[in-house]
Amino acid sequence: MDEFEEYRNPLTKRYASREMVCNFGEKRKVILWRQLWIWLAETQKELGFDITDEQINEMKSQRDSVDFGTAAAEEKARRHDVMAHVYTFALACPKAAPIIHLGATSCFVGDNADLIMLKDGLNILLPKVARCIDRLAKKAMLHKSLICLARTHLQPAQPTTMGRRICMWIQDLLLDLENLERLKNHTIRFRGAKGAVGTQASFMDLFQGDHQKVIKLDEILTKKSGFQRSWCVTGQTYPRKVDIEITNALSNIGATVHKICTDIRLLSSFHEVEEPFETKQIGSSAMPYKRNPIRSERACSLARYLMHISTSMVSTVSVQWLERSLDDSAIRRIVLPEAFLAADACLTLLQNIAEGLIVYPMVMEANLNSELPFLVVERILVKMVSEGAANRQECHERLRKHSHEAAAEIKLKGLKNSLMDKLLNDYYFAPIHSLLPTVLDPSYMIGRAVEQVEVFLNTEVDPAIHSYKDCLALNSNITI
């Protein structure tokens, strides 16, 4: 069949990195199953089972040579993917066949392999989050003193700095970094060798009731698989609430990326910032002048999918009847890999945007100046009262009247902001006419914005990404 005749997941084909795609690939999964069977046999041998080095070496030699055709035919006949691969591996390892999967249940390979892939997925994402933080931190430091107009409700509010605004984006990413680190270091544990319903009964039979050997089996397998701990109590599967924790954290990344890229799109519409735009890039087939923020738009599109993906894991947990039902199987095959692929794609885009983000200081200044007279009205009121030149209520009313007249001229006639001219022409405000230039200086209105940027980057950001310093240099390239 031609590759263009069948549906291909766009996350795999267009958006996610090859590293993440391969991490959840079918071949990787089956090789992990085989590695788990090898570790099981090795550990059983260490604990006294009659298993030979020849059998183990045979399994190792055939680990990566997977006959997927035979496995597919067996699964069609047996309706059981793990048993199909037990059969296929046994065909390739006739001497080891009697001891493959000895005492294990399907979830010994299925769940434990999933946990390894999930942990490795986190290890792929963590440096990507750190690189996004690093790139934005550089922009924040560069623009820590660049004054711009802050907006609340998407309406003019007060002056801030572009660096300070970027730090708000970084703060959300820091929370995402902490979430992923918590998952990797504390939440995800190995399922281990727990048997069909979690009681380890099959292994108790194999070890003739020797509790210590069963405990040791679980401990050794946990360490061999790269985990510090295994779950003490499970059903047939590891606790599916782990899947909720993981997808929630990934959904949070989606929310962060969506917020940042939406902000960039909004600022782009004000001509204050612009995402990278290639020399030969075309914004519109009909409008040659267009410079659309397509990377931010794509990131938002992927992020919306990612934000809603965790709800399926919540409902899956709720239908895990007693020790287990198979309600989890099909949906986990789809949701867990796609959540990681979507998060991977979002972070790759965000890093690329951050690396090439263009800032236009002159436009920021012009936009700020157009609103600045309104923003200083409260300062003028305070100055008038503190100089003993006015009654507060009377002054407030005059300022209100002049402000509304100036606003009406802007909206109805398209004129420039004339509020300061009105105040200069009103003898009532004569006591502070000489102070108006100082009042209009926005550098007096940004509070501790610059200092906050410096403190935040030095005391919170740098320590958070220090452990990733060896992988921060990698740039993000978008080819589509």
UniProtKB/Swiss-Prot annotation:
It catalyses: N(6)-(1,2-dicarboxyethyl)-AMP = fumarate + AMP. GO terms for cellular component: cytosol. AMP binds at residues 14-15, 79-81, 236, 298, 329, 333. Fumarate binds at residues 80, 236, 285, 290, 292. GO terms for biological process: 'de novo' AMP biosynthetic process; 'de novo' IMP biosynthetic process; AMP biosynthetic process; AMP salvage; purine nucleotide salvage; purine ribonucleoside salvage. Its EC number is 4.3.2.2. It is an enzyme of class 4 (lyase). The active site is at residues 153, 284. The keyword Ribonucleoprotein does not apply. Coiled coil: none annotated. It holds the Pfam family Lyase_1. Belongs to the lyase 1 family. Adenylosuccinate lyase subfamily. This is Adenylosuccinate lyase. It comes from Schistosoma mansoni.
